[in-house]
Structures are given as structure tokens and as C-alpha cells.
Amino acid sequence: MTEVEKIYEFKEELGRGAFSIVYLGENKQTKQRYAIKVINKSELGKDYEKNLKMEVDILKKVNHPNIIALKELFDTPEKLYLVMELVTGGELFDKIVEKGSYSEADAANLVKKIVSAVGYLHGLNIVHRDLKPENLLLKSKENHLEVAIADFGLSKIIGQTLVMQTACGTPSYVAPEVLNATGYDKEVDMWSIGVITYILLCGFPPFYGDTVPEIFEQIMEANYEFPEEYWGGISKEAKDFIGKLLVVDVSKRLNATNALNHPWLKSNNSNNTIDTVKMKEYIVERQKTQTKLVN
């Protein structure tokens, strides 16, 4: 019996990836439940092993209410066990659609928590690099406004002067400076938050097309609109917030601190109801066309 098996009882499987299986685990003494990610080290390629090491290093460093926490780590010659905080609410967008509708103030509340978590990461010189709906999970089924950032597989810890140049992320959310291959920094996460906010408020992404190159062309020029049919009831402060994130010039893009001080996040009490029909359509379409850039 391994050390982790002495402490935790492994219950049902929660999910699996190419090299890992996630189980529901229960501490035998406290009865507290966790998600335990079991990674088969022998099957890892060099790139995946490097990303995994970076992910673990990051998880060890962070402690924020809106970031999924690493509780314990067990390393054996064959396997790595990550004992993680258990979140049970599912993916953010799925739960919004399930709820049927929500308000602009709800959206601002969610975005504020995401920006707070990203600002915390940036303060530690950590860039997530792959912020998207699938990586935004609800902590519980009961509270649709308590969100947590997950999946640090593409994240990097950066030095003060290091500029990253590896193309990574998911097409609809990737920042123009990543596509330009001229190097990029923390600002990429703020661009992704702009895209996520746009979708939260209307149900579809700002950049879309029949092919990935078409999407990239729109991103490179920040070519997007606020169609009146879907944005007529949304506040000008929300549009201004998005407009200050989806900026090609990174020097003009809001950082996390400035974003938290934006009027839309500081004092939003709008009860404008947001319909989720378009978001439901987007989720279905997204599941059909899951595509990633080469990491």
C-alpha cells in the first residue's frame, strides 16, 4: 500500500486525460473529500513532463480563494498524486446555461473574481496563458457566482525581464501578440478575460470565422463589434471595460489592478437580464470544434 493510499480512500473516477485519471478521494481520518489526480509518469513525453513540473511548481506557490488549491503531493517512481481541492459545480458556462438567465451584475461579479485571481498570479510572476471557459469552474452546485481557475498546464513562471515566445492557448481566446510571435507577457491573460467577459454578456465570442486563420485575422486587428440586437441592454461601462481589454497595443491594455478599479467592476448593480440561448448554441459549437495551438 502506497503512502497516499494509507491516508486517502479512492472512490469513483471523476475524469481522465491522456496520462492521468482523477478520482474522488476521501481522507480516512477527517472524511474530507478531494479530487486526486493520478499521473502515470512512465507514459509522459518530455514536453508534457516539463509542463507538469511547471504546473506543480505553480500550484505549490498559490493560495487564493478563486484558484483551485493543491493540498498535498505524493511522488513515487511510477506515479505522481496531486491531492486537489474538490470543486463540484462544473464548468462556468454550462451552469449559466443550466440556470437559464442571469444579470449583468452577476457577470461583473464573476469577472471581478477572475481578475482578482489573475492579478494575484501576476503578482507572483505567473502567467496562466490558457484562460477559457473550460478552465473556469464553479466551486459548488449551490452558488453560481463562486468561481475557481483550474488547469495550469500551459502556465509559466516568468522572470522580471523574460518575454515568452511559445505559441499556446486556444484560438478564440489567444492574444494578438501571441500570434505575432514577437514575444508576450502577462497582458495575454487580460486579453483572454476580455473575450470571456464578451461571451458572458452576449453568449458568443467577439472573434469567429469558418476557419482558424479567419479567427486569427480578426484577432490581429481586434476586429469585433457590439451588435445592437444582443448588446442593446448592456451598459456602456461593460462595453468600455471590454474595449480596454481587447486592445492590440499591450501598453494600452488594462492590467489586473486597473481592471479591478474600472467602474464596471467597482460599482455594478445592473439588473439587466442576460438571456443564455446564444451561449447554449456557442457551447454546442465549441464542443464540435475543440482545437488547440501547438504548445
From Swiss-Prot:
Q: Catalytic residues? A: D130
**GO process annotations (BP):** adenylate cyclase-activating G protein-coupled cAMP receptor signaling pathway; cGMP-mediated signaling; mitotic cytokinesis; regulation of chemotaxis; signal transduction
Q: Does the keyword Transferase apply?
A: yes
Tell me what this protein is called.
Answer: Myosin light chain kinase A
What gene is it encoded by? mlkA
**Xref: InterPro entries:** Kinase-like_dom_sf (IPR011009), Prot_kinase_dom (IPR000719), Protein_kinase_ATP_BS (IPR017441), Ser/Thr_kinase_AS (IPR008271)
Q: Where is the Protein kinase domain?
A: 8-265
The modified positions for Phosphothreonine read T166, T289
